[in-house]
C-alpha cells in the first residue's frame, strides 16, 4: 500500500487550487434563459428518476406479498 507523505499531499492540494483557479477564470455566468432551462431540465430529470424509483418500489412490494 502506497503511503502519501506530507510533501506529496501539500503538492496535490496546491495543484488542485491552481486547477480550480484556472477553471473559475475560464467559466462564465450563464444568462437568465440558459439558467432557467438548466433548472427546468434538472427538475424534470429528478422527477422522472423519482417516478421510476417509486414504480420499482411499488412493483417489488406487490410482488413480495
UniProtKB/Swiss-Prot annotation:
Keyword Cell membrane among record annotations: yes
Cystine connections: none
GO biological process: intracellular protein transmembrane transport; protein secretion; protein targeting
A GO term, aspect molecular function: protein transmembrane transporter activity
Places the protein is found: Cell membrane
Statement: the UniProt record of this protein carries the keyword Protein biosynthesis: no
Keywords attached to this entry: Cell membrane, Membrane, Protein transport, Translocation, Transmembrane, Transmembrane helix, Transport
GO cellular component: plasma membrane
Membrane topology listed for this record: Single-pass membrane protein
Membrane-crossing segments per the record: 44-64
InterPro entries reported in the protein's UniProt record: Prot_translocase_SecE_dom_sf, Translocase_Sec61-g, Translocase_SecE/Sec61-g
Known function: Essential subunit of the Sec protein translocation channel SecYEG. Clamps together the 2 halves of SecY. May contact the channel plug during translocation.
Protein family membership: Belongs to the SecE/SEC61-gamma family.
Subunit and interaction comment: Component of the Sec protein translocase complex. Heterotrimer consisting of SecY (alpha), SecG (beta) and SecE (gamma) subunits. The heterotrimers can form oligomers, although 1 heterotrimer is thought to be able to translocate proteins. Interacts with the ribosome. May interact with SecDF, and other proteins may be involved.
Protein name: Protein translocase subunit SecE
Lineage of origin: Archaea, Thermoproteota, Thermoprotei, Sulfolobales, Sulfolobaceae
Gene name as annotated: secE
